């Protein structure tokens, strides 16, 4: 969301970070792999997903590998001049470097994995409540991809237990391409589905521009992605 991106240090230190422009984040499909254990509704999920570092499986601590990625989601009220929203719950989930999601056996399109073994696992999923600076931060790894989709992260926002936004965020392709030829990602290589032809992001160039993370960093040291979720509250 280029018009609403706030630099990391500014967003994390200023309780009322300024924004340039004020755009409602496009609503997108939830996707087939949200975390819903035992039929629990999304708004009722608590631990083990209340965490900043989402890289590990909660039950055994086994970590997903890949290039480090810090995600900073700023939540703003588009009905209030994009003022920061405190106390919003931001949920995220995404696939691992080989294109698989935790918690599901019936999936396809990834490589070098056994989806049936991922049932009951929780890696690369979590939620945080926006802090005094209206930022929810996550420590994760750069996602891979699976057939038919551009590289992406799913996100949802709840206010007072009510779902107020479902969305997905894309990555700049030049960065994804550089990541996906590094050692941890070579089993799949460069994503064959581009942002502009993706079934979610490809329907509007304007929406794609407003759904793309602002990225800093490199493949050696890792990346930081920043995104402002604009919601009319």
Outline where the language-model segments fall.
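Beta-strand-dominated extracellular/periplasmic modules and repeats
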Residues: 19-207, 230-233
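C-terminal, well-folded lobe of enzymatic/effector domains
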Residues: 210-233
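N-terminal export signals
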Residues: 1-14
């Amino acid at each position: 969301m280029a018009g609403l991106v706030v630099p990391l240090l500014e967003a994390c230190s200023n309780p009322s970070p300024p924004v340039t422009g004020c755009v409602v984040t496009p609503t997108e499909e939830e996707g087939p792999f949200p975390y819903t254990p035992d039929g629990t509704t999304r708004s009722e999920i608590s631990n083990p997903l209340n965490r900043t570092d989402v890289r590990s499986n909660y039950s055994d601590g086994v970590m997903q590998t890949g290039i480090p990625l810090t995600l900073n989601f700023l939540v703003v009220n588009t009905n209030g001049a994009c003022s920061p929203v405190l106390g919003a719950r931001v949920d995220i989930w995404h696939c691992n470097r080989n294109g698989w999601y935790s918690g599901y056996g019936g999936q396809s399109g990834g490589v070098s994995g056994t989806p049936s073994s991922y049932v009951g696992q929780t890696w690369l999923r979590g939620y945080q409540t926006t802090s005094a600076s209206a930022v929810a931060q996550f420590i994760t790894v750069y996602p891979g991809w699976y057939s038919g989709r551009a590289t992406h992260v799913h996100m949802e926002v709840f206010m007072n237990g009510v779902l107020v936004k479902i969305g997905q965020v894309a990555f700049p392709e030049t960065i994804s391409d550089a990541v996906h030829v590094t050692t941890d990602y070579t089993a799949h290589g460069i994503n064959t589905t581009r942002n502009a032809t993706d079934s979610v992001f490809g329907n509007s160039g304007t929406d794609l521009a407003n759904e793309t993370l602002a990225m800093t960093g490199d493949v050696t040291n890792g990346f930081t992605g920043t995104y402002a979720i604009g919601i009319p509250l």
